[in-house]
């Protein structure tokens, strides 16, 4: 593995696509969208487009030609750069995870993409965009074995190691297709889908004939309220179906496999992805229950771990169970991460804290209602309907707030829109703080906060208006054994 190797030639095409994606909006704004071009010959625009395309293709080829990788002296070494030569040496013991994915183009040529990530990186430290699956598996196995102080010297030993890993691994969770549809339908992806569509369309506002659209819209309004309502419902239903299908495609064939040292998560229909997570890098578990799933006894579970990159938002919090029934949750956690076994029974916050949750909602609500009543009278009076909704929201936040200590585990539960339960090992906690305002002090309440490492940032659990003596119990539980460096 010490001989420099290049990526598969299809990496040239991948580089071209990447460059086009990065330049598409500036290209449309500067070249394609018509503007004031009096006096400029008509052949200039096609010439500019042709030059840009040639530059993109040439740069993509040179990037592929100048990119090499190899394994040497306990390091993964990459050399790249068209004009300025860049050398990146990554020590094996700094590697936190290796993520194998298969895009549509890679799958056509039986290739994969390998991301190698270290702690504290803002992006993947090494990206091999087009290599064979056997090479990716060989790199993964070799680095894992080297990190465990075992050095295979030949192909036979590599195969023995692979067989041993296969024998020790077992599939502990698999999301079924009906469960995936239920997960997608209750995920709230519609809002993300709509916002993405609006953001995309807004980039091309000069190309959209708004005057014609609005003229047609005026004619459309004359068709009546019923037709308008029906049209809006059909449009929302179409967006909902598209958002649901996109989630199902993204998480299709979701499987969790555990070995002695790692958790391997694979998923995807069009783009297959396999993420390998070292168990000793896991910092905590986060359980999320949104407004739809909680009444149904369903939850989504994430792993917080000291890895990932800012470019890949998914790698900061890894989805362990996309959708699982709460009654089966502890059994599955016991199979995968037995150190996080807990009954999740919480100590609730005191009843006198409820008034503070309601009070905080009214601090925001009163100015809003006042403005609506003042500027939109008489329809503004309908804003008073927000009062019972605010009280109900405050009660839900109060009801779902709590804490628990079980051996070396701290559990903090709270709600903004979705209920979050953060399970943390004492040795992984970076800090615990509690503070109290003058108003909290009058009622002997305080706010407790605990943080763990998650990617290059921190994941914070916070519960407001906890009994002050309970905060002191949590602080004293944590103080004797300070959290160790999780890296």
Question: Where is each model-derived feature located?
Answer:
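N-terminal basic, Ser/Thr-rich segments that initiate or prime the first beta/alpha elements at protein or domain
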Residues: 1-487
């Amino acid at each position: 593995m010490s001989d420099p190797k290049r990526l598969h030639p299809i990496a040239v095409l991948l580089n071209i696509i990447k460059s086009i994606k990065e330049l598409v909006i500036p290209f449309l704004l500067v070249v394609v969208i018509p503007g004031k071009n009096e006096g400029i010959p008509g052949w200039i625009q096609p010439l500019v487009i042709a030059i840009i395309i040639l530059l993109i293709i040439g740069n993509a080829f040179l990037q592929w030609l100048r990119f090499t990788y190899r394994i040497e002296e306990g390091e993964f070494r990459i050399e790249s750069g068209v004009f300025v030569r860049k050398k990146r040496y990554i020590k094996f013991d700094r590697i936190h995870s290796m993520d194998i994915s298969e895009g549509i183009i890679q799958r056509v040529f039986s290739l994969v993409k390998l991301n190698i990530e270290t702690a504290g990186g803002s992006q993947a430290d090494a990206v091999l965009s087009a290599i064979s699956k056997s090479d990716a598996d060989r790199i993964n196995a070799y680095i894992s074995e080297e990190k465990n102080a075992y050095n295979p010297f030949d192909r036979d030993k590599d195969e023995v190691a692979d067989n041993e890993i296969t024998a020790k691994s077992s599939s502990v969770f698999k999301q079924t297709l009906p469960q995936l549809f239920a997960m997608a339908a209750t995920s709230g992806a519609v809002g993300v889908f709509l916002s993405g569509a609006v953001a995309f369309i807004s980039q091309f506002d000069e190309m959209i004939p708004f005057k014609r659209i609005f003229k047609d819209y005026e004619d459309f309004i004359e068709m009546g309220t019923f037709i308008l309502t029906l049209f809006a419902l059909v449009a929302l239903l179409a967006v909902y179906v598209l958002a649901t299908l996109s989630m199902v495609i993204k998480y299709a064939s979701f499987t969790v496999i555990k070995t002695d040292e790692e958790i391997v998560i694979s998923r995807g229909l069009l783009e297959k992805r396999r993420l390998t997570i070292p168990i000793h890098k896991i910092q905590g578990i986060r359980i999320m229950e949104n407004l739809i799933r909680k009444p149904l006894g369903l939850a989504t579970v994430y792993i917080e771990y000291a890895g990932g990159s800012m470019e890949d938002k998914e790698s900061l919090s890894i989805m362990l169970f996309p959708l699982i029934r709460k009654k089966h949750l502890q059994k599955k956690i016991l199979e995968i991460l037995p150190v996080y076994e807990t009954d999740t029974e919480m100590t609730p916050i005191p009843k006198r804290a409820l008034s503070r949750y309601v009070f905080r909602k009214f601090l925001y609500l009163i100015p809003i209602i006042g403005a609506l009543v003042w500027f939109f009278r008489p329809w503004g009076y309908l804003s008073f309907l927000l009062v019972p909704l605010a009280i109900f929201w405050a009660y839900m936040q109060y009801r779902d707030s709590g804490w628990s200590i079980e051996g070396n585990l701290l559990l903090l539960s709270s709600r903004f829109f979705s209920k979050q339960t953060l399970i943390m090992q004492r040795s992984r906690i970076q800090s615990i703080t509690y503070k109290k305002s003058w108003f909290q002090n009058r009622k002997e309440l305080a706010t407790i906060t605990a943080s763990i490492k998650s990617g290059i940032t921190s994941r914070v659990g916070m519960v407001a208006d906890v009994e002050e003596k309970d905060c002191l119990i949590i602080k004293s539980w944590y103080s004797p054994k300070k959290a160790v460096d999780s890296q």
